[in-house]
Swiss-Prot record:
Expressing tissues: Expressed by the venom gland.
Disulfide bond positions: 75-90, 82-95, 89-110
Protein's name in the database: U11-theraphotoxin-Hhn1p
Residues annotated as signal peptide: 1-21
Comment block on domains: The presence of a 'disulfide through disulfide knot' structurally defines this protein as a knottin.
Annotated spans, Disordered: 61-83
Length: 113
């Protein structure tokens, strides 16, 4: 009867120790898989970020081209007072001191070139 108990105890100890080894091995495999998954997610995230940056650059390029081709805005028309140091006269106009009329205002006006 003692041999049966000893045999049973020996088998039980071996099963428990081998089971724990399998558990540790499974845990290590799971860690490796999660690390691989994380690296894949990092790669996918970086790829998506690059695509978004390229798209943003294209959109900003289109905006700058559009602003270059758009009409002039916020300019001063003909016969309107302007600042001598910062003339904002429309294209084709120049900020000049008036010849006859308006000299008493001591101001500059936008005139045709």
């Amino acid at each position: 009867m003692n041999t049966v108990r000893v045999t049973f105890l020996l088998v039980f100890v071996l099963a428990v120790s081998l089971g724990q080894a399998d558990k540790d091995e499974n845990r290590m495999e799971m860690q490796e898989k999660t690390e691989q998954g994380k690296s894949y997610l990092d790669f996918a995230e970086n790829l998506l970020l690059q695509k978004l940056e390229e798209l943003e650059a294209k959109l900003l390029e289109e905006d700058s081209e559009e602003s270059r081709n758009s009409r002039q805005k916020r300019c001063i028309g003909e016969g309107v007072p302007c600042d001598e140091n910062d003339p904002r006269c429309c294209s084709g106009l120049v900020c000049l001191k008036p010849a006859l009329h308006g000299i008493w205002y001591k101001s500059y006006y936008c005139y045709k070139k």
